[in-house]
Regions:
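Entry/capping segment at the start of metal-dependent catalytic domains
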Residues: 1
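Active-site-proximal helix-loop-helix substrate-binding element of RNase H-like nuclease domains
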Residues: 5, 9-158
């Protein structure tokens, strides 16, 4: 739905995939380049999700690290990914981004609305007469929530 990123600590960009925006080619290339280190909180989640996205939309760029003996194959090579959640655990910090940020006293705290926004946009909803029988909430169903979701995504990268 959304892809937020920053290059070398620069300004955070949020790509609105759900509304047709595309990830820049240089970022796609960086995601598949094992010489470029990628950092994320819960990096394995990001790596697996991006593997699926790249296989589906950029199959010519996707490079799997798997071998025939690998039972969980066809994902981006984890060797160029670093996980700040693992680092937090190593230092005895909470394993949530919000918890680690609070303990460290980070200036930019995780937005509290996030869980509700994730439920609204990322979890199927019950079809009702009120919602027109839909089973997914899309950006056009509540643009103000969608804009807040984009801010939430940006803050997570900051």
């Amino acid at each position: 739905l959304l892809f937020g990123y920053s290059v070398d600590g620069g300004e955070v960009a949020v790509i609105d995939i759900a509304q047709g925006e595309g990830i820049p080619t240089e970022i796609i290339d960086a995601l598949t380049d094992e010489q470029i280190t990628k950092w994320a909180f819960n990096a394995n989640f990001e790596r697996v999700c991006l593997s699926e996205y790249l296989r589906r939309f950029y199959p010519e760029k996707f490079i799997s690290y798997s071998t025939k003996e690998d039972s969980v194959s066809d994902y981006l090579d984890p060797s160029s990914w670093k996980c700040s959640m693992v680092w937090a655990a190593y230092m005895g910090l909470p394993l949530s981004l919000a918890g680690a940020g609070a303990v460290l006293g980070l200036e930019e705290q995780k937005l509290t609305e996030g869980k509700e926004l994730i439920r609204y946009f990322c979890v199927p909803c019950k079809a009702t007469k009120v919602n027109g029988g839909r089973t997914r909430n899309l950006p056009q169903h509540d643009m103000s929530k969608w804009e807040m979701f984009k801010k939430y995504n940006k803050r997570d990268v900051e």
